[in-house]
Design a protein with these regions (language model features):
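The feature marks the mature, well-folded catalytic cores of soluble enzymes
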Residues: 1-297
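Helix N-cap / loop-to-helix initiation motif
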Residues: 84, 310, 368-369
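Short coil/turn segments at secondary-structure boundaries
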Residues: 134, 263-267, 388-392, 424-430
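Ferredoxin-type iron-sulfur electron-transfer modules in oxidoreductases and energy-metabolism complexes
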Residues: 275-301, 317-422, 426, 435
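Extended amphipathic alpha-helical segments enriched in small hydrophobics
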Residues: 307-311, 356
């Protein structure tokens, strides 16, 4: 059966040069991550500790949420609770309307992508400007992020340069030097910061013991977003909490090393309260996270810190791109989150996995995305989403393997497959595996026969 992912992936791989470049780009990030890990003898201890901290926090989430919100409110921060995406969007819109805001700048936030906040606000007359360079690029192109950390990594500098020329951001036609393009973007965004009436940030970590909202960036755009406007809104998923600074230190050592292969992000900003004369709001969002917590088989997805390491190492993601997935978060973690959101809608993505479990090996908080995808595959039949052809073949193989005599007899006829023309076995929608693979040749005698004849020892 041809899934939506496989159709999109086939389209992506038609451009062999770009596919190879995309693969190599992410593999280089994976190699940087490995180098960072090898420099720390305590690396595996850090991963284990991060997993334990997340497990503890999630299992005591109500207590930590209460502590976090009280610490914020004690310093004048207004805390809001959103049960779902719709309520989150309405809360944000209400805050902006109360302050008569027409333009809002924002730093990177996958939560706002999850809630589809930007189009909602734009429909209500609010101009939302992304200030992360990658996010701004894809916003101007009308695209979605293809990666949760490097949203525009699928684009080459020539594509970005031409778009900047069309939008009037770049003045030197044909100059696609990355440094020049970055400077053009900086000048373009400075005007947006000056004009905005509000700034929004995401939140990488919320420190319960102190009420800190911690934002990690490499561009400093979160600091500009909160420094210029007098209204600061923080969008935060309830799973982002850690107990204290000691716990935060563990995650800060892991996050950037796993995500981009750097020792740390260039900027780590802590927001505890509004600056004098300004106002700060924190919107804590559930949007299905409580349901995930109650799922005994897949609750560990809440341990994810959104570093993107599973995507950087995944051979399927690297060779098919982020837009091949039907859920807004691609890659191994996105497959799992999509299934938790709507298994009927996003079950196609489950096939986008080789089960190599490389993602399990690199995940800093030991979420085990590959192992969970395997578990999802086992439940496809119950969901009524199992591929009928694969199911029939599996049942046929089970029938054969349960009957040794029949299996042995069938092996004797296997060489007859060599006589079947390749056009009937390969390059056909009946056998997607055959595309790109040479036709295997069956030996005249099986290993079993050779063993019986004493020719194999």
């Amino acid at each position: 059966m041809s899934t939506e992912h496989s159709k999109r992936a086939a389209k992506f791989t038609q451009n062999v040069e770009k596919t190879t470049w995309h693969d190599a780009t992410f593999w280089s990030v994976r190699q940087k991550r490995d180098k960072m890990a090898q420099e720390l003898p305590e690396w595996e201890d850090l991963r284990e500790h991060a997993s334990e901290i997340k497990m503890h926090t999630i299992t005591h989430l109500a207590d930590y949420l209460d502590m976090f919100s009280k610490n914020l409110e004690s310093r004048g921060v207004k805390v809001h609770w959103a049960k779902d995406a719709q309520e989150f969007n309405e809360i944000v819109l209400g805050i902006l309307k109360d302050h008569n805001v027409k333009k809002m700048v924002k730093s990177k936030s996958m939560l706002t992508e999850e809630c589809e906040m930007n189009p909602y606000l734009e429909q209500h007359g609010i101009d939302v400007v992304e200030t992360d360079l990658g996010e701004r690029i894809i916003q101007l192109l009308g695209q979605k992020p293809s990666h949760i950390v490097m949203p525009a990594i699928h684009l080459k500098r020539e594509e970005v340069g031409k778009m900047f020329e069309e939008k009037g951001i770049s003045k030197e036609i044909g100059n696609y030097d990355p440094t020049y393009l970055t400077r053009c973007a900086r000048h373009h965004l400075r005007d947006q910061f000056m004009e905005a009436g509000a700034g929004m940030t995401g939140c990488n970590f919320g420190v319960a013991a102190t009420g800190d909202c911690v934002v990690c960036t490499n561009e400093g755009n979160a600091d500009m977003t909160t420094s210029m406007p007098k209204l600061h809104i923080v969008a935060m998923g309830i799973e982002k909490l850690v107990p204290d600074y000691k716990s935060l230190a563990v995650f800060q050592r892991l996050l950037c090393r796993c995500g981009t292969g750097q020792p740390t992000t260039a900027f780590t900003s802590h927001f505890r309260q509004a600056r004098p004369g300004a106002e700060m709001h924190v919107v804590l969002v559930d949007n299905g996270r409580s349901d995930i917590l109650a799922d005994k088989d897949h609750w560990q997805t809440l341990k994810c810190m959104r570093c993107g390491a599973c995507m950087n190492t995944c051979p399927v993601y690297r060779r098919s791109g982020g837009y091949s997935y039907t859920y807004f978060i691609p890659g191994p973690i996105g497959v799992n989150l999509g299934m938790l959101k709507n298994p009927q809608k996003y079950s196609d993505n489950v096939s986008a996995c080789t089960l190599c479990l490389s993602c399990d090996n690199v995940c800093p908080s030991k979420v085990g995305p590959g192992s969970q995808i395997y578990a999802w595959r086992q439940s496809l039949d119950k969901l009524g989403k199992a591929d009928s052809v694969k199911k029939a073949m599996s049942n046929g193989m089970k029938y054969l393997f349960d009957r040794p005599a029949l299996y042995t007899t069938a092996l004797k006829f296997a060489p007859l497959v060599n006589l079947v023309p390749e056009c009937c076995t390969h390059f056909s929608h009946w056998n997607a595996w055959g595309i790109g693979h040479a036709k295997p040749e069956f030996a005249k005698k099986s290993f079993h026969q050779l063993w019986k004849e004493g020719k194999v020892k």
